[in-house]
Amino acid sequence: MTNSSSSASPTPATSSSPSGSDRLGLTLKLLGWAVLGLLPLYAWTVSTAPIDSVQGMMQKILYVHPPLAYGAYLGFVATAIAGGLFLWQGREVHDQLAIAGAEVGTLFCTLMLITGPIWARGAWGPGNWWVWDARLTLTLLLWFVYLAYMLLRSFTEGDERAARFSSIYGILGVVLIPLNYWIIDLVGGAMHPDNLEFEEESSSLGVGMGLPFFVGNLTLFFVFIYLLVLRWRVGMLRTEAERAEFDSRRN
């Protein structure tokens, strides 16, 4: 993960105060307990879910793949919102949240790009590892966009102008998310069902498949929030340490 922060903040006492990182620490503990409670339930519901008569065991990736997509989208939206707040207020806490959103979102997007082809190959045969489906292609583009964001932050650490440029970049990049959602309805897809079809299939899963699908979404949502807050807190603690070191040298 990148180790980047902007060099200046108009309100350092507010944006990087120890009490702020302490609150994030408490939130992190609560989220950790929630994740620990949900993971066994998630594993149990997936393992006991009925096996699909057509796709077999590969169908169980349904309980992982869509939740990963939602996590990726949430991460990139968090980057855009936090970037907008940073441009408005110039506070380090928002810049660190933007970085955290991009990194965790890219992690989820990477796992989504891995699980999707595995599912396709298992369901439709060896020739379907990768098909240039419209949504799949846009997802790959989305991955490259936020990978570039992280590389930019890595190579421009401590540059406030780069932080502001990255904020604008993150806001523009998030436009790909609604496009990614609607692209199947606009041009169709070779692998993904259209949105109405997916919603109808999801609502008609029944208890056997519907419960693990719901628990999977809930669990990976909490995993996403946990990782987001963890990375956010690490960034804030690093910023506080750097500021304290700078103050000690100045004094």
Language-model features and meaning:
Residues 2-251:
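Polytopic transmembrane helical bundles with strong interfacial aromatic enrichment
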